[in-house]
């Protein structure tokens, strides 16, 4: 085991604080509408230019091991805020820096670190309650667009496109962000349920101009096995021929004689039919077939539940308004399933999302839920260069997370105002002693830090702005974008409650641990091994003649 270096007391705290300040100072320049960019060197390709706090934090590694420990702990604050709410990473970093700096001053002055931490924790718990009381519901598209705009560093086009996407696919719908090909942002919306399986034979195509199969008011047959014998399908096909309606078959596979017969019947116009493979594999395929069954009001024909294809009737089939099948995708539009059953299925998938520990499973479950709940929207980010594309894509992703958080827990006045208003209401929180009281004061001072930093980044005197805002009431605050004061909600400057709450809780949690640190342990640098000795001279007796 390698030898360790141990530092104690004030020496440890000074080193740790230096690391905290280096990382926080690099991150906090990005805060607010007039925040600056940070350029990150990449081992290959062009440097990355960003205003995303967590991206900056993740890049920072310090040479001094004790300073690096301080930096890594603040990095943890940014990462946790990002994981919980998807935004607010810079705010969380600014709050953590303020609490650590004030807290370590108090420890150096002889106060009890544990009581300071208890005071900070009490203040934060009271602040969270007040934040929830201050919160307002974020229901309409205008408010969603405003939240997106603020999170995307005052880029209105991003806020608007996210609001439009949410309007199209609903609050539960899946919205993904991709790199586009154009200069402007674009929005693609896939309505209905789409899955990545295309037609099994090009002979099913009935729209040669688009290379697609389009079925109007079709029946939908769902089978959880391979179909290779046409006799299994005959009862269904005979019943279908009488109705004159088209049929979509979704099965594990349709092959051999069964596929050939379907193709021939389709080409002759006896029955209008198309077949696709079921999406997914294994248990996920069974679940997705059940999703389609609920969406279309049909039944999955599966032998494990005692249903046989030969005995299936038209009552077992689902129906939809329209189905479009391309080479790669199948889209079922306006399935005729019962609304209550669809809602119940969505609720069931929601429960699974909460319980799963796998990110991959969570993503797939969210996709399934979105396909049932409304659809999928794809925001294609446009930019002139690759460097701009990466920076803009990161902002769109942040804004998307912020709007989701706003829909979930509501919004509070932005620009750091919410924390200032909350601080004024919790000044008299109950404490056991003077040191705990000072812990509360530390938390209250820290809650002003985001507002002060926004003002500093805008080139204003932080103390003047902070005092002006504190002397106001309600939603009155400072708009750094146009250097004016007024009602933050009316000016459209909103922060998601969840983002503000998460930033405060994670900052206080990690900062409290740092204040109570008394020793730090790190590996000593390994001594370099000596270089190999040089080779000996040439062979003897080889002199020149």
Curated annotation (Swiss-Prot):
Binding site for ATP: 30-33, 51, 87-91, 415, 495
Subcellular location: Cytoplasm
Main location: cytoplasm
Cross-referenced PROSITE patterns: CHAPERONINS_CPN60
Catalytic reactions on record: ATP + H2O + a folded polypeptide = ADP + phosphate + an unfolded polypeptide
InterPro entries documented for this protein: Chaperonin_Cpn60_CS, Cpn60/GroEL, Cpn60/GroEL/TCP-1, GroEL-like_apical_dom_sf, GROEL-like_equatorial_sf, TCP-1-like_intermed_sf
UniProt cross-references to CDD domains, sorted A to Z: GroEL
CC annotations in GO: cytoplasm
Keywords (A to Z) from UniProt: ATP-binding, Chaperone, Cytoplasm, Isomerase, Nucleotide-binding
Function according to Swiss-Prot or TrEMBL: Together with its co-chaperonin GroES, plays an essential role in assisting protein folding. The GroEL-GroES system forms a nano-cage that allows encapsulation of the non-native substrate proteins and provides a physical environment optimized to promote and accelerate protein folding.
HAMAP family, per the entry: CH60
Protein family (similarity comment): Belongs to the chaperonin (HSP60) family.
Protein name as catalogued: Chaperonin GroEL
Provenance organism: Shewanella amazonensis (strain ATCC BAA-1098 / SB2B)
């Amino acid at each position: 085991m390698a030898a360790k270096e141990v530092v104690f007391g004030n020496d440890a705290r000074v080193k740790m604080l230096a690391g905290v300040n280096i990382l926080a100072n690099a991150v906090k320049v990005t805060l607010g509408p007039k925040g600056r960019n940070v350029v990150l060197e990449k081992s290959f390709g062009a440097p990355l230019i960003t205003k995303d706090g967590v991206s900056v934090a993740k890049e920072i590694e310090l040479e001094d091991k004790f300073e690096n420990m301080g930096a890594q702990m603040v990095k943890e604050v940014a990462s946790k805020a990002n994981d919980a709410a998807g935004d607010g990473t810079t705010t969380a970093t600014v709050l953590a820096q303020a609490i650590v700096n004030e807290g370590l001053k108090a420890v150096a002055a002889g106060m009890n670190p544990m009581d300071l931490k208890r005071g900070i924790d009490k203040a934060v718990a009271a602040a969270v309650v007040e934040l929830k009381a201050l919160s307002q519901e974020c229901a309409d598209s205008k408010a969603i667009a405003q939240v997106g705009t603020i999170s995307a560093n005052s880029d209105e086009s991003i806020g608007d496109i996210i609001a439009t996407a949410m309007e199209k696919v609903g609050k539960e719908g899946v919205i993904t962000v991709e790199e586009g090909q154009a200069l402007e942002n674009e929005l693609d919306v896939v309505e209905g349920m789409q899955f990545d399986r295309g037609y099994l034979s090009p002979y099913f195509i009935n729209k040669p101009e688009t290379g697609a199969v389009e079925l109007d008011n079709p029946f939908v047959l769902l089978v959880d096995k391979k179909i290779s014998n046409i006799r299994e399908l005959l009862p269904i096909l005979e019943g279908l021929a009488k109705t004159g309606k088209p049929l979509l078959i979704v099965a594990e596979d349709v092959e051999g004689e069964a596929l050939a017969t379907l193709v021939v019947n389709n080409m002759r116009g006896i029955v209008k039919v198309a077949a696709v493979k079921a999406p997914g594999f294994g248990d996920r395929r069974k679940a997705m077939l059940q999703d389609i069954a609920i969406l279309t009001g049909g039944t999955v024909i599966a032998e494990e539940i005692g249903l046989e294809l030969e005995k299936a009737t038209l009552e077992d089939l689902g129906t939809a308004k329209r189905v479009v099948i391309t080479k790669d995708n199948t889209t079922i539009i306006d399935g005729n399933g019962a609304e209550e059953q669809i809602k119940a299925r969505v609720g069931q998938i929601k429960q699974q999302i909460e319980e799963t520990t796998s990110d991959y499973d969570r993503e797939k479950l969210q996709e399934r839920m979105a396909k049932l709940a409304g659809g999928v929207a794809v925001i294609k980010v446009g930019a002139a260069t690759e460097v701009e594309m990466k920076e803009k894509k990161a902002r769109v992703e942040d804004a998307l997370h912020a709007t989701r958080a706003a829909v979930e827990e509501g919004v509070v006045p932005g620009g750091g105002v919410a924390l200032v208003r909350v601080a004024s209401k919790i000044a008299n929180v109950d404490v056991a002693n003077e040191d705990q009281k000072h812990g509360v004061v530390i938390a209250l001072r820290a809650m002003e830090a985001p507002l002060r930093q926004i003002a500093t980044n805008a080139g204003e005197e932080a103390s003047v702005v902070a005092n002006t805002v504190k002397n106001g009431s309600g939603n009155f605050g400072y708009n750094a974008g146009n250097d004016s004061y007024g009602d933050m909600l009316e000016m459209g400057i909103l922060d998601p409650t969840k983002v503000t709450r998460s930033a405060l809780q994670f900052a206080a949690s990690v900062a409290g641990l740092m204040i109570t640190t008394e020793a730090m342990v790190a590996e000593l640098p390994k001594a370099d091994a000596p270089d190999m000795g040089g080779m000996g001279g040439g062979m003897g007796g080889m002199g020149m003649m």
